[in-house]
Curated annotation (Swiss-Prot):
<dbReference type="GO" id="GO:0005840">
    <property type="term" value="C:ribosome"/>
</dbReference>
<keyword id="KW-0687">Ribonucleoprotein</keyword>
<dbReference type="InterPro" id="IPR001848">
    <property type="entry name" value="Ribosomal_uS10"/>
</dbReference>
<protein>
    <recommendedName>
        <fullName>Small ribosomal subunit protein uS10</fullName>
    </recommendedName>
</protein>
<dbReference type="InterPro" id="IPR036838">
    <property type="entry name" value="Ribosomal_uS10_dom_sf"/>
</dbReference>
<comment type="function">
    <text>Involved in the binding of tRNA to the ribosomes.</text>
</comment>
<dbReference type="Pfam" id="PF00338">
    <property type="entry name" value="Ribosomal_S10"/>
</dbReference>
<dbReference type="InterPro" id="IPR027486">
    <property type="entry name" value="Ribosomal_uS10_dom"/>
</dbReference>
<dbReference type="GO" id="GO:0000049">
    <property type="term" value="F:tRNA binding"/>
</dbReference>
<comment type="subunit">
    <text>Part of the 30S ribosomal subunit.</text>
</comment>
<dbReference type="GO" id="GO:0003735">
    <property type="term" value="F:structural constituent of ribosome"/>
</dbReference>
<dbReference type="InterPro" id="IPR018268">
    <property type="entry name" value="Ribosomal_uS10_CS"/>
</dbReference>
<dbReference type="GO" id="GO:0006412">
    <property type="term" value="P:translation"/>
</dbReference>
<dbReference type="GO" id="GO:1990904">
    <property type="term" value="C:ribonucleoprotein complex"/>
</dbReference>
<keyword id="KW-0689">Ribosomal protein</keyword>
<comment type="similarity">
    <text>Belongs to the universal ribosomal protein uS10 family.</text>
</comment>
Length: 103
């Protein structure tokens, strides 16, 4: 796998789970002899929702909710076959969305 690059994007609502999963990926890649760039924190997406608490009157009574989506990026430069096998066997947390692309 010469001149290859694996780009891993992690997404989730809990930043602690993402950091833990990122640390596992980086540790696994370094242990198998690959060169790692990252983790790079990407901008957090904040979605805000405002909801009226009363069904009919009292427009001033509102609740506000926020949903934060945290993202991290890890680049693995020049991965070995052992690196790819170890990453495929890696079991990450359930609350983390992982996207892997080869470049």
């Amino acid at each position: 796998m010469q001149n290859q690059r694996i780009r891993i994007r992690l997404k989730g609502f809990d930043h602690r789970l993402i950091d833990q999963s990122t640390a596992e990926i980086v540790e696994t890649a370094k242990r198998t002899g690959a060169q790692v760039r990252g983790p790079i924190p990407l901008p957090t997406r904040k979605e805000r929702y405002t909801i009226l608490t009363s069904p009919h009157v009292n427009k001033d009574a509102r609740d506000q909710y926020e949903l934060r989506t945290h993202k991290r990026l890890v680049d693995i430069v020049e991965p070995t076959e052992k690196t790819v096998d170890a990453l495929m066997r890696l079991d990450l947390a359930a609350g983390v969305d992982v996207q892997i692309s080869l470049g």
